[in-house]
Every structure is written in C-alpha cells, then in structure tokens.
Amino acid sequence: MRNDTRKHFNNFAAQVAKLNGVPDATQKFAVDPTIQQRLEKRIQESSDFLSRINMVGVDELKGEKLALGVTGPIAARTNVANQDRKTRDLTTLDAQGYECRMTEFDTHLGYAKLDAWAKFPNFQAMVRDVIVRQQALDRMMIGFNGTSAATQTDPVANPYLQDVNIGWLQQYRTQSPARVMAGGKTNGKVLIDPTANANEPGIVGDYATLDALVYDVVHSLIAPWFRRLPGLVVILGRNLMSDKYFPLLNQLPPSEQLAADLVISQKRIGGLQGMDVPFFPDNALMVTTLDNLSVYWQNGARRRFVTENPKRNRVENYESSNDAYVVEDFGAGCLVENIELSEKAING
C-alpha cells in the first residue's frame, strides 16, 4: 500500500469509527442504529428490484410477519337488527412467522486496487459503494435461490448461495406447496408447445404459450381476491425470455446488459407485466405483487470491523447482519418450475 493510499484508508477507518461512535473501527463493534438504517437504505436504493420490495428493520430475531401487503377484501354490510358488525383483520394470519439468521458479508480489497482508487477524490464512497452493491446482489441471489441455512456454508457446492438462508421460492415449496406447479402431463415437466390445444393423440404439451400458462396459474393458484390486484407481475428465468416480450434487451451493449438490475417486458405475459431479475432460476416463473416479498433485518444486530492484513496485501471488511426473507401472503402469488419450451415454441 502506498503512503498516500494509507492516508485514505486511515481516514476511511476513522470515519467509520466516528459515524458509529466507537474509538476504533478495527475492533468489532455494533453498527449504530441510525447508521444501520442509512446503510440498509443505500443497499435497497442500489438495486431497482430491491427498491420495489419491502426491506424493513425488526426488533426481534423471530416473530410474526409484518403483513405489509394487501391481504383481502374488507367491504361488507351487516343487518345490525340481527347481529353485530364484525371487523376484519388486515394482517396475514400466518403461523410460520419469520426468523432472522446471521449472514456474513465479509470482503477484502487488495493493496493494488486501493492504490488505483487512491487518486479519486471520492475514495471513501467508492469503497463503501462496492460493498453495498455486492450485498444487494447477494440478497437477491439468496431470495431466489436459498433453500437452507447451513451452520457452515459451502460456496463451491452452492454457488448461488443456496445454503445461506431460506428464500422466497423455497418457502412456497415448503409452506404453500398447493400454489406451486412443478409438473404437467409429464411429472417434473411443464411443457410449452404450440400444439398443446390440439385434440390429437400423442400431444404432450401442457400449454400452447407462456401467456396461456401465466393466465391459467393466476386463475387457479392465486387466491381469488388477489387475481385482479393491481401490481401483479411475472418474474421469469432468463432462458424463458424472448424478443416478443423483451425486444430491447439484446440491443443493449454488453456493459448495459451486465448493469441492468431489472428489465421490464414491453408486452404483457398472460396479461401481466413481465420482469427479468438477476439470479432468478431458469425454467421457472413466479407471479406475485412485489410488495408481497420482503427482507427483514434485525435492528441493532449488524456487526462490523475493518482491518489491514499485510500478510495477504489487502484490507479486510468483516460485516454481518441478521436477515430473514419473507413472503407476506402466500395467497398473493404462485410458483411454476420445470418449464420447458419445445422447438416449435422456441422457433415460433
């Protein structure tokens, strides 16, 4: 590390300590609650997708869901001559609740990288933003791919962070399997084929188009009072996208494709807006309102310390947060997996 870089690093560590009211950021400390809220806001705002869902702080490690979305109709009329008026609970009655699990977001930056950044006047913001952005990406990856919360995670065996926490899709599989379609005429396969509607022997296709699939699951797997709710969207795997729905994606330069956090379809899919979100699994789609998906983080539970490791020629940032991924109301969404497009469906 060059001497001028060291000055920048020392100022960065001093600023982190000052903001959190601790004498030294190189010793483990609890992030100040106000700073934690500001950091979580930065993480959310760094992602177009996370900005559209709920990211809220909770006081308890586990408890009842906050029920942040609409949970059903309340309008009624009562003949008070015969009975009393009755109120309706606006919150979700869900015995599952939530449980926050400690998640480590440990990173490092090599001396060479820091030396290259030292010439920029916004050095501290650059260091902060690269950490914030990766935490946002990791939360999306866990939300769509997480299936367990292992005591010791294995990033080699689980490259999509499947063992870090239990994500939204896995909760549908385990807590609301009736709203999950994983097969059609053939077990383990939902086949899209233009001949699906033909009354001919040997036809194995389940739906003629993705539009037909989406329309059907909205009317068969989602609770009736949510089916026409404004804000229902279709999140689908990248391999199911086509120029019909996303004609502009392939026209973007590679750098913009990489930076695109959330791509919205120009045409509707089964009557709903389609969305391509990073790390959503291939061969799958999810219908939901975005405010039905949440990330809870525990207030006062974020821990951090920053240290230099000259043995590895780098600066290390150790950070942890207690997080939970929550589906507010399973009735407001559904999941379809194992979707296959036939050659006819792909080639039109």
Where do the protein language model's features map onto the residues?
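Sequence/fold signature of self-assembling virion shell proteins
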Residues: 2-14, 19-23, 27-47, 163-216, ...
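A sequence-level detector of short, solvent-exposed, charge-rich linear segments
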Residues: 54, 58, 62, 68, ...
